[in-house]
Amino acid sequence: DQPISIAIDSSGIKVSNSGDWIRKKWKVKKGYLKIHLAVDPSSKECVSIEVTKEDVHDNKEFKPLLEDAMSKNHVERAYGDGAYDARANFNLLDANGIDAAIKVRKNAVPKARGSYTRKLAVMEQQKDFDTWKKEKRYGDRWSVEGAFSCIKRIFGEYVSAKKFVNMAKEMTMKASLYNLFIRMTMGRG
């Protein structure tokens, strides 16, 4: 198998298609779902998906997404924004021999505190962020944003199901159909 990179991010999906004025009038808060994706930047396909409720932080889903992606593919690099800047994530990537292309927070301190890999990433990014971006091909992270955009444009920004289990199944099905469309347009399907 060819090694792949993955870009990880999350986005919100409305649980209702009713207008915002209904929520305002009746003071009903419907909330939203969070869809967490790992996308292969070269093929643009969703490699892994997790669906959670709105109160789950992106960082908590990094490990399940990565492990699911590793079970199906040989992952060589993982992209993530500042929400995934955690020592545990850097350690997980290092333990599996995966190159970390995670943007650290602006106020990050270059101290190891249990993660030498993160310390090196902080020092590298603080020294020259533009060079780091080019070396890591950090722009490839946008492939996951493109996947969210396509899924929302094709299938809508909401789910039709009422129960959480069925909402998760619906979003997984939408991601699978998105992959099918990508394969068809790229001539692989």
Predicted regions: what they are:
Residues 64-67, 113, 167-169, 178:
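Short, charged/polar low-complexity linear motifs in solvent-exposed/disordered segments
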Residues 82-153:
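Helix-centered, glycine/charged polyanion-binding patches within enzymatic domains
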Residues 31, 107, 121-123, 178, ...:
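Intrinsically disordered and other compositionally biased segments
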Residues 1-99, 104-105, 175:
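Polybasic low-complexity intrinsically disordered regions
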Residues 130-189:
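Basic, amphipathic alpha-helical segments enriched in Lys/Arg and hydrophobic/aromatic residues
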